[in-house]
Amino acid sequence: MHHDPASCAGDHESPLDCAVREGGHALVEQLVASGVTRVFGVPGESYLSVIDGLYDHTDDIEIIVTRQEGGAAMAAAAHGALTGEPGICMVTRGPGATNASIGVHVAKQDASPMVLFIGQIPRDHQHRESFQEVNYRQMFGELAKEVIEINTVERVPELTVRALNAAVSGDPGPVVVVLPEDMLVEQTDAPLKSRTTPAPVLPDAHSVQEAHRLLSEAEKPLIILGSTGYAPELGPLVTDYCGRNGIALAAAHRRMHLVDNSSPAYAGTFEFGRSVLENNADEADVIFFLGSRPDPNTGEEWENYRGGAANGQAGPGVIHVYPDPNVIGRFFPAHVGTAASPLEFMRALVEHEGGGSGDGGAAGGGAGDSALADARRAWQKKLHDDWAGYIERNLQTSLGGPFMQKFNARFDAETIITNGAGNYTAWVQKNRTYSTFPSHIASQSGSMGYGIPAALAAALEHRDRTVVTFAGDGCFMMNGQELATMAANNLDVLVIVVNNSLYGTIHMHQEREYPGRPVFTSLDNPDFAALGAAYGARTAKVSTPEEFDAALAEFASAPGLRFIEVVTEGY
């Protein structure tokens, strides 16, 4: 994507004269020229020049003032997940930056593009432990892709573009930009830079050929689709490819919306612990990680890979395609490992296949082996049916199942659902199917408090769609203050808080590891319905599926902020 500065234009080769302005104003101009349309943040005196620059561009950039920096940073991370473009967050030094660090961690683990701008103490105050001083290169060295401190005002446009591009290149993620207060108020006529985002990395022909061979020869092939390098057209492309070739297709942890769950190829999604999908995946003879990173929730510990990986040998038929070469082979060796755009790799694979035809397609039976094609079809059907049965059993027997039956009947596939972390997340992960991207925004980092800021980002980006956020009682209290931000921006969001008066996930682990010794996990909660009303929401408090359904009937299509507290027992 190419963004041309609207004014004060220039590039590295042919800079044009610009009006003299403060460094903070130049930064805002560069953001506008680079296509940024929204920023999240909490104001601070350390970057007042940037804030003043925003005053001149309120028609270009939507300013979302949040109530805590952690909420702002998580919303920015969610924006990156929703759009593929960097979410922008602005905070002040010291406490502002430390509060925002949780969102940087979320963006890193989710591979979500994000740029965090931090006001900094003046340059001549540094290295004295001055008021609110932090060394951000040290603080964010492990959390961010890159930490850039702009110490020369003339480099503001250049380094701003560099940060935006770094956030989306390779393995997408967070970039931190540090802005010394005195630098921001210096005058500069530095020209703006044209931003040309990095082109996708094309696959090499040998890797495509080898991947095709492995998939063609496999009896039980499985593709695991992740969101890194994801484009909306990738989901239908890989689903169609798997469908005609007898390949099972799974979604990485909390990435169900990448695949139409109704497809006969869909095999389920990976989650905490072992489900029917993990058990089935142990039998796969070829596994293709496509834009996904193996981790404890997406296949890192599968039994059939441990022996080979421990001996330094590739496990059975591992293919790994990921935009960043540093991720390839990090978890276990791969027969085919290549740094490439997942979309471009799939396009090349389909082209190599010749489009596929007949039973099993070109990748479905090698040289027309009907027995192999039949075996692949049976494998694909088994995984699809096993997962469908798993979802149905959850709907009938799990704590959240009866409630989600009511929810699913009233909210269609266009609904965007967000959640944070906790046992309540099983309500939307194990009791609902997805078919539209984006329709489920959740963090792979296991960060409580993510769902509310993610809903804020989703409602701003998709004002024409229904947005529902689920939170546990513990999870909600981490960032519930952002309901005030939703109300201030007149957003239509339904908030559902599942209240069991526990940090339920930890209590569950505690009972398993140290049975009969509960401590440190019970919660004395406020009146959530009253709290929601204080934020201006219409509220309801329910405890049965029937009461829940009645509240949904009232709130489902109503505008504005709505809040349902669901009182439950158990976890």
Task: Provide a role label for each language-model segment.
Residues 2-18, 154, 213, 314-421, ...:
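Phosphate/pyrophosphate-binding active-site segments
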